[in-house]
């Protein structure tokens, strides 16, 4: 269930935490409730939980207008987006054209902007939209070519599957702090936040909307005041450990890509009273090895 549900490839995506999130929902009697992501990005984890029946609704928010435009196109312009996926040529010439559209950032044409974002995500190295080169290089002399991650029918299928859940997917385009403050009193008691801010280190190289130290502190101040249970995931750096020092912190072994075996360590921070699996609390959690017990 946790694999390949999102049409986007996203750096630092947390789909690999699907089993962990499902267990947290179950152990805290939050199943079939609402699930909230202030930083939607690729939405892989949120969609996996929705498709798996672990939550009834997901609230996804992203400040980046290009990312928001893509998700808005899935929910509100499904067939038009599917036709673009099926018919647009995947060539270097088209890559240049789509990059110009994305860089223009015309939010008055969300389908055009959303598709450009999607096109670059599927054709750029590692799915990095900002400042990344095209797969295979402009000369296309690399081992992999521009279209190697652009399986039209599979991607169209994913888009149509998501659209079937449109009435249970709530999309916003707000600053994450503003979003959390506005939604916290509106969601039901059985709700869980999964908060995955831009990395503290190297965030500027991965995200359009990256944070400086003050912004990270602003986020933590808001998170610590939330009424509902939450988990926060971050790169494991001392600065983040310091600003969340009043909450429990655990190191997680994370698989950064489904296709590779590269594993790194990230920090998980949990709200007061949230029950966590012993693999997390005892420091033995490895995402690739963790499963949902019956």
Q: Model-found features: residue ranges?
A:
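A short helix-to-beta-strand connector/capping loop
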Residues: 54-56, 164-169, 245
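A structural signal for isolated positions on well-ordered beta-strands in alpha/beta enzyme cores
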Residues: 59, 170, 229-231
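Non-catalytic surface loops within mature trypsin-like serine protease
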Residues: 65, 122, 271-273
């Amino acid at each position: 269930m946790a694999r390949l549900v999102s049409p986007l490839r996203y750096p630092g995506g947390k789909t690999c935490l699907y089993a962990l999130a499902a267990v947290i929902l179950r152990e805290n009697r939050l199943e079939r409730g609402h699930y909230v992501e202030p930083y939607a990005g690729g939405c892989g984890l949120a969609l996996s939980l929705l498709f798996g029946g672990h939550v009834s609704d997901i609230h996804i928010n992203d400040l980046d207008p290009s990312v928001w435009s893509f998700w808005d196109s899935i929910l509100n312009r499904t067939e038009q987006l599917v036709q673009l996926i099926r018919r647009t040529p995947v060539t270097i010439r088209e890559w240049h054209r789509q990059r110009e559209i994305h860089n223009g950032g015309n939010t008055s044409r969300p389908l055009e902007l959303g598709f450009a974002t999607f096109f670059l995500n599927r054709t750029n190295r590692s799915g990095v939209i900002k400042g990344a080169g095209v797969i295979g290089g402009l000369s296309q002399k690399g081992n992999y070519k521009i279209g190697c991650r652009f399986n039209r029918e599979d991607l169209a299928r994913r888009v149509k599957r998501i659209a079937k859940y449109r009435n249970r997917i709530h999309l916003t385009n707000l600053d994450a702090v503003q979003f959390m403050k506005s939604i916290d009193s509106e969601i039901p008691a059985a709700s869980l936040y999964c908060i995955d801010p831009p990395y503290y280190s190297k965030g500027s190289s991965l995200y359009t909307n990256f944070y400086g130290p003050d912004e990270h502190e602003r986020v933590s101040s808001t998170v610590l005041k939330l009424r509902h249970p939450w988990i926060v995931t971050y790169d494991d750096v001392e600065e983040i450990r310091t600003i969340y020092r009043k909450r429990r912190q655990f190191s997680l072994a994370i698989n950064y890509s489904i296709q590779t075996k590269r594993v790194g360590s990230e920090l998980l921070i949990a709200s007061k009273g949230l029950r966590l699996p012993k693999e997390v609390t005892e420091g033995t959690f490895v995402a690739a090895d963790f499963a949902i017990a019956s």
